[in-house]
Amino acid sequence: MKNKNFIVIGASGGIGSQLVADLNDVHCNLLLGYHNEIPNIDYPIVRSAPVECQSFESIMSFIEDCKNEVDHVDGVVSLPGSILLKPPHFISEEEFHDVINLNLKSAFGVVRAAGKLLNNSSIVLLTTAVTAIGLANHEMIVAAKAGIESMVRSASTTYSSKSLRFNAVGPGLVDTPLSDRITKNPKALEISLKMHSSDRIGSPKDISAMIQFLVDPKNDWITGQTFRVDGGLSSTKTP
């Protein structure tokens, strides 16, 4: 993938920072969008700018600016997300809108911008493995993420004439700052480990590897799919 041009939105998060490092290792050209925290990067990039991922206008403007910086955008990866684990009757209307906006609206904004601005490109969105199973207290996050999985199927059809591919990656529990409330809690971590037949939680590199596979132009016959990278969480039953 040497010299391919990739946009990464959410580049300063746990998965985003790993993906950016991995793409740099294979000599890709990077155009990075971040929210509050500027990515800590010590290698050259084409563009780095703040993006309000819950704003259609901000996403459209950022992707358009990136397009104008390079001869062709080979892929866009959208990584914004959140974890809110509560029974529905404890979730406020404000929390509901926050989760929907950060997860589903941000992904829709990327699909919207890609459909208008790009051709012959791979778009990868982030969902969660738990949309495939019924875990207690996950109603809010699966409501947002399941919409992303349906969206990649529809968008793959809508924009097939532009040679745009849309896929989603659904991680299990991954060791990132976003999941600290689980991974740093010994009891919660023990329970989570028992749900993954691989007997470990994921690392950002596990997710980065799948994203790199999907944005690689060599794999351009893959579209409209959700890939669960979850250590068996969604597909196996542990003793």
Residues of each region from the PLM?
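Short C-terminal tail/terminal secondary-structure segment
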Residues: 212, 223-239
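Substrate-binding pocket helix/loop in short-chain dehydrogenase/reductase
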Residues: 87-88, 92-100, 192
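Short, small/polar-rich loop/turn modules that mediate ligand/substrate recognition or access, typified
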Residues: 160, 165, 222-224
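A conserved structural motif in NAD(P)-dependent oxidoreductases
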Residues: 196-207
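Catalytic loop of short-chain dehydrogenase/reductase
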Residues: 124-148, 152-161, 174
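N-terminal Rossmann NAD(P)H-binding glycine-rich loop of SDR-like oxidoreductase domains
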Residues: 12, 20
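Conserved NAD(P)H cofactor-binding loop of Rossmann-fold oxidoreductase domains
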Residues: 79-85, 232
